[in-house]
């Protein structure tokens, strides 16, 4: 079995006809329906899911074979997993999925291991890699060709040029943060 | 003329000096700033600022469509990464 990703989790029930509320981890919550069928964490149970609506940031869906509230309640807390290859495969040049970047080993240009990618975030000024440094500390690097010259998803690594901060005479006055 | 127009955009005084210095150096350095309240001006386009969020400096590469916004808008103080598994990151 290849790598899998969790696209959602069942967090509650909706109504008395077996509908469930799902916290979706896809970029557009309702897109979780496109990944049906899904399986639980153990891979033993398959779920065919049909999205029927959205409420308060959660997706409402019906599951094939689940027709009453009690059966739906028993699924509360179940994660919904799909194989990695089911995620969008066609990416433009220099485009990467967040889930592929997270966990990559971070190396300096000279090959020295610096740490791993903890998270990727976009605060409105482009994507930023949050890197957990080894043995401790963290570093934020803009996801640009200058700062991240090499991304090797297959090799599980990326190369980073750590940011150089301009000297600041006011730093001590501001608490040296 | 409206008061907000003749007063001009707010900017902490030292920001322009820092930006000029960084641009003159020619190196691609990150400029550490604590002034989240300052407005992003056209002369900052192309520079990278490390905007303090109370904990760390978030790198902000200034582009044209960020002019007029405040630096603090791009450096959230409460971080929630989310879980978007199929979200795409574009390397610029």
Curated annotation (Swiss-Prot), chain B:
Pfam families according to UniProt: Ribosomal_S19
Keywords, ordered alphabetically: Ribonucleoprotein, Ribosomal protein, RNA-binding, rRNA-binding
An example Gene Ontology biological process: translation
Alphabetized GO MF terms: rRNA binding; structural constituent of ribosome
Single GO cellular component term: cytoplasm
Entry-linked InterPro entries: Ribosomal_uS19 (IPR002222), Ribosomal_uS19_bac-type (IPR005732), Ribosomal_uS19_CS (IPR020934), Ribosomal_uS19_SF (IPR023575)
Superkingdom in the source lineage: Bacteria
Alphabetized HAMAP family for the sequence: Ribosomal_uS19
Protein role: Protein S19 forms a complex with S13 that binds strongly to the 16S ribosomal RNA.
Family that this chain belongs to: Belongs to the universal ribosomal protein uS19 family.
Name of the protein this chain belongs to: Small ribosomal subunit protein uS19
The gene coding this protein: rpsS
């Amino acid at each position: 079995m290849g790598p899998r990703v969790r696209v959602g989790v069942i967090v509650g029930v909706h109504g008395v006809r077996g509908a469930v509320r799902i916290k979706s981890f896809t970029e557009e919550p309702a897109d979780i329906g496109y990944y049906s069928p899904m399986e639980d964490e153990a891979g033993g149970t398959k779920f065919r899911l049909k999205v029927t609506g959205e409420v308060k940031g959660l997706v409402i869906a019906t599951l094939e074979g689940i027709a009453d509230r009690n059966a739906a309640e028993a699924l509360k807390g179940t994660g919904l997993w799909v194989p990695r290859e089911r995620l969008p495969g066609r990416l433009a040049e220099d485009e990467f999925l967040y889930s592929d970047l997270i966990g990559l080993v971070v190396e300096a240009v000279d090959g020295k291991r610096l740490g791993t990618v903890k998270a990727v975030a976009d605060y409105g000024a482009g994507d930023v890699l949050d890197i957990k440094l080894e043995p401790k500390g963290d570093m934020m690097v803009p996801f640009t060709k200058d700062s991240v010259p090499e991304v090797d998803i297959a090799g599980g690594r990326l190369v980073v040029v750590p940011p150089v901060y301009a000297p600041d005479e006011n730093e001590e006055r501001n608490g040296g943060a | 003329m409206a008061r907000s127009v003749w007063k001009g955009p707010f900017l902490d005084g030292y920001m322009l000096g820092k930006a000029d210095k960084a641009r003159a150096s020619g190196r691609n350095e990150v400029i550490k700033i604590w002034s989240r309240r300052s407005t992003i001006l056209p002369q900052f386009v192309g520079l990278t600022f490390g905007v303090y969020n109370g904990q760390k400096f978030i790198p902000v590469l200034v582009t044209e469509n960020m002019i007029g916004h405040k630096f603090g808008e791009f450096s959230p103080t409460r971080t929630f990464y989310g879980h978007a598994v199929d979200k795409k990151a574009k390397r610029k």
